[in-house]
Amino acid sequence: CGVLAALKKQNIKVQAYKCGPDYIDPMFHRTVLGIDTGNLDTFFADADAIGRILARDTKDAELIVMEGVMGYYDGVGGTTTMASSYELSKVTKTPVVLIVDAKGASVTLAAIIRGIMEYKKDSRIVGVILNRVSPMFYSRIKHVIETECGIPVLGYLPEDASFAVPSRHLGLLQPDEMQKQRDWVETVAEAARKTIDIDGILEIAAQAEMLQIQKAT
């Protein structure tokens, strides 16, 4: 949500999707962007159908953001990559910025990131953002990761209790149940604008391949 809000603050027309059938995250996307958003799911739709959804919904968009689900390669049954974020990136030819929880680790982060990149030759991972790190640590580890992994580190978010989405016994609160949700979005967006390289993300997005859309028969 922070990246979406930061992009919107730059007056970029963004369309957002959630990988998989999750209905809560798209509600947050709608709260941030003020437009209808949706889901892309390679379990329920093949590549052509997903292409048609994108063509239908993004005519006025300048940028499409797809939020992943679970671990990057985690798919159906917990033992496959089927319907994973990785599969969606392949189907849509989307460059991937990996979000990594960096709390409690240092050089091992480079090993984790490189391992994820090399697990599949076509991982499409071209950048990384670190979550839950201090500014001081980020300034030191950024160079290590870029040197070891060969991709840019596009910023970070510090650990901050105010960024957390309140939870309940059945899971995350829905946006219309959150008190001061607009303030929460603005807090995260302001942090993202300060610590995440939005211009770097836009440069990566500009390198996305053209997607060929097959008409429905």
Language-model region placement:
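Glycine-rich phosphate-binding P-loop
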Residues: C1
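Internal gly/pro-rich beta-alpha loop/helix module
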Residues: S106-A216
